[in-house]
Amino acid sequence: MRILIITGLSGSGKSTAVRALEDEGFFCQDNLPVALFPTFVDLVDNAKERIRDVALVMDIRGRDFNKGFEKVFQEITEAGHLVDILFFDATDEVIIRRFSETRRRHPAIDSGSVPEGIRSERQQLAGLRSFATQIIDTSELNVHQLKDLVISLVKGGEGGREMTVHLQSFGYRFGLPLESDLVMDVRFLPNPYFIPELKEFSGLDPKVRAYVLKHDETGEFLTKFKELLEFLLPGYKREGKSYLTISIGCTGGRHRSVVIAEEIRDFFKRKQLNLKVSHRDMEKG
């Protein structure tokens, strides 16, 4: 049986994720005490009607969530079940805005402000976050994009936990992507931004791509970066990692990082992996 543990900050999109999983045929259980996880899994596993996919929501509403979760996860895994922990996160500013829109009280505090609740919740969830299989930053996602991402994660993990690679470009000016497993800084490469006839185009434009790739340091970097990925990917697969996020950053996220991400896309196409490519800040930079 495949089990997804859905956890993370209040206001980060867990409810949306659960609805997406229900649409994909997952049996979902919300707010179950951690101590009851093994019993619940046994009951579902022995049910007359075979259930293959289960999602359990675990957050601060269950007051004992911080007690013994490591042991509980170990018990479930040793019973032969595939367990992935999806931790949903977002920036404080985005969560504050979402609470303001819904006018809900933050569940981490009985009184006080939403920012205080967020700080408290981050502290309480720090240990659980370290166990996450995948950290999902929903700050820049709308409801439909989040549902699509969750579904791609689920489908990418089917069939023997085949690994899905999310390759994204970004701009340091707009902050690091929280969900990154690997971050590569390409700000040392020649910058088309300072070439007047290239400045207004993105890294998807053939002229910008040709400019970045014609320099010797770009070719040498790509060779070494691909060698690093050749070394790392088998290790991540052996670990059982089902989703790998590689973030490539330049100053504004419009030129160099886009070119390099597209070059690495071609490299991954030959690896028979599930591949998702996005350019987070291309239209901002």
From Swiss-Prot:
Keywords on this record? ATP-binding, GTP-binding, Nucleotide-binding
Q: Enumerate the PANTHER family for this protein.
A: RNASE ADAPTER PROTEIN RAPZ
Record NCBIfam families: PRK05416.1
Q: Where are the transmembrane segments?
A: none
Name the UniProt record assigns to this protein: Nucleotide-binding protein Geob_2284
Described by its record, this protein's role is as follows:
Displays ATPase and GTPase activities.
Give the similarity note. Answer: Belongs to the RapZ-like family.
The disulfide bonds in this chain are none
